[in-house]
Amino acid sequence: MLTSPTYDGLVSDVKSIAEVVHRRNIPLIVDEAHGAHFGFHKAFPENAVAYADAVIMSVHKTLPAFTQTAVLCLCSDRIDEKEVEKYLGIYETSSPSYVLMAGIERSLRMVSDGGSELFAAYVEKLSCFRASVRDLKHLAVPDAEDFSGEEAYAFDPGKILIVTKNGMSGQQLQEILLRDYALQMEMTSGNYVVAMTSFMDTEEGFGRLSHALHAMDARMEDTGKAAFSPKDIYRQPEKQMEPYQAEEAAHGSVRLEEAAGQVSADYIYLYPPGIPMIVPGEILTEPMIQIVRQCQEAGLDVEGLPETDIINIVKNARIDYN
C-alpha cells in the first residue's frame, strides 16, 4: 500500500512501483486521498488508476463534495471484487447518507461535464498566483522544479506550500494569516504551511493570499535563524520490539525528560498529517525527545501523549542506548 500524493502534494512514481510489485503478482493499493483531481489537466500528475490495482480517493478534499465522501476504484482483476463487496457489507453502515452519496454524484458530474473548462481556468489562476509571489524575500512558495528527484517524482501544483526563511515557525505563520488576513491554512509544519486549493477557488481568493504574503514579507527581517524542518522531525528510531508486542505489554508513564532509553508504548505524531514520529516498540532517544519538545514549543499539535510532559512506556524494557 502506498500513499501518493502526500499531504504536501509530493507524488510517487506509481508506474514504476506498480511494475515492481506486479512482477511478483502483488496487488498495489494507492491511498490517493489528496489526488481526486489528478488526470483532468496535463498540469497535474497522472491519476494512480492507470497503474494501481485499487485506488482510494477522498472526493471531498480537492473536489466540491461534502466532507466524509470518498470513492474506492477497483482497477484490475488482481483485486477480487466479490471479496471487496463482502467486507464492505461487514464494515459499511446499514444506514448510508443519501445526501453524501448525491453530493459525490453531483461533484463527479460537474467534472465530467465541464472539467476541461474548469481545470483550464484553475491552472491559469494557479499560474498567475505563483508568478505573483516569486519576488518574496523572507517567504517562499516552491514549485515542482524546487523538489529533487529523491524528494518526489512529481508535485501537485494545487498544493501551495508557504515556507519561512527567517526562523518563523509554520504555526506562527498560520496564526498571522488567520488573525490578520482571515485566511485559513490546511496544515502547519516546522517551517511551512500548506494552503489547499481547488477549481472552486476564485481570482479574488488567490489575490488575497498573494497580498497577505507580500504584506507579511515586507515586515519581516532576516533573523539569521532557521525553524526546524520536517527532515529534522522525521527520523528513523531504533526498534526494540514489534508494535503489537509493545501494545500488549505492561505499560507505565514517565516524564518526557526522564524517557531517554525507554521503549515507547504509544504512537506520537503531528496531526495533520498524522505521520508517526515515534511508534510503539521504538526506543526513545534524547534527540527524539528534544524534537517532541521543539514541536510543542513551536505550537504544533503533538498527539499521542497522555499529558504535555508525560509519555507512556513499556515497563521493564529500558535500554542503555549510550
Where are these regions (language model features)?
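Charge-dense polyanion-binding interfaces
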Residues: D301-Y321
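Non-catalytic surface loops within mature trypsin-like serine protease
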Residues: S76, N166, F199, K315-A317
